[in-house]
A protein has these predicted regions:
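Short, cationic-aromatic polyanion-contact patches
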Residues: 222-234
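Long, hydrophobic/aromatic-enriched structural stretches that serve as scaffold segments
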Residues: 22-67
């Protein structure tokens, strides 16, 4: 959930939802601490330095750039945004695979792209206001899932991927010629290969657990992480 995430009440609501639904493979509280540290760093940015924000063509980073710009709305710094997906496709001729996330690029690639964008001007006030307003719209939504589709952030029902998960497990059963249990991590790997969208693996794992609890999938193991249990169709 993103509702009112720029306020303490929204942060608390998101923390509670993640704690109840998502199996992050890290210590409890790590995400909350990282988020709090990031918010503090944004707040402490001094006013006399330019700010560069990198983002790629996925829902996480497209939402993130709008969220950060909203948090920085009172700052007078020059703001620069760099779409790493567009720049990678434009300048990295020898690319071996598509880039879904900025974090997939190594430092040398980022350096090249930064140099290529040095002459680009800062965001205009109009563009900043537009992106800040888009964040406000997102923060008023009750959607639990958003995807990047047709160059837009689109809210989807929480069960959006459920039928695809079921179809993928059925496909694996047919390919293996058996209905034996399949490791959940393997299922998620297959899902990511077939999806034309960048999807958070922990959200997919949450939906698999939902399909177990609703009686559509059978479980073997303890679902404390995607590596620790297997599933099959009932």
């Amino acid at each position: 959930p993103l509702r009112n995430l720029h306020e303490k009440v929204g942060i608390a609501a998101r923390d509670e939802w993640l704690y109840d639904h998502i199996n992050y493979e890290q210590e409890d509280g790590t995400y909350r601490q990282q988020f709090a540290n990031t918010m503090r760093q944004i707040e402490d940015l001094v006013d006399d330095v330019p700010i560069y924000i990198w983002y790629a063509d996925n829902a996480d980073e497209q939402i993130g750039v709008r969220f950060i710009l909203y948090l920085l709305r009172e700052k007078t710094n020059d703001m620069y945004i760099i779409n790493s997906t567009e720049q990678y496709e434009k300048y990295c001729v020898n690319k071996e695979q598509p880039i879904d996330y900025t974090s997939q690029m190594d430092s040398e690639v980022l350096k090249v792209l930064f140099e290529k964008n040095k002459e680009t001007g800062p965001l205009s006030n109009e563009k900043r206001i537009q992106l800040e307003t888009e964040w406000q719209v997102l923060s008023e939504s009750k959607d639990m899932l958003r995807i990047w589709l047709d160059n837009e952030i689109k809210g989807m029902p929480e069960h959006y991927f459920d039928s695809f998960i079921m179809q993928t497990i059925e496909k694996i059963h047919k390919e293996q010629g058996t209905t034996e249990f399949i490791n959940t991590g393997f299922v998620i790997g297959e899902l990511l290969e077939q999806l034309n969208a960048s999807v958070n693996i922990f959200f997919l794992e949450y939906r698999i657990r939902h399909l177990i609890y609703s009686g559509q999938l059978e479980l073997k193991g303890i679902p404390k992480s995607m590596r620790h249990y297997s599933v099959r169709l009932r």
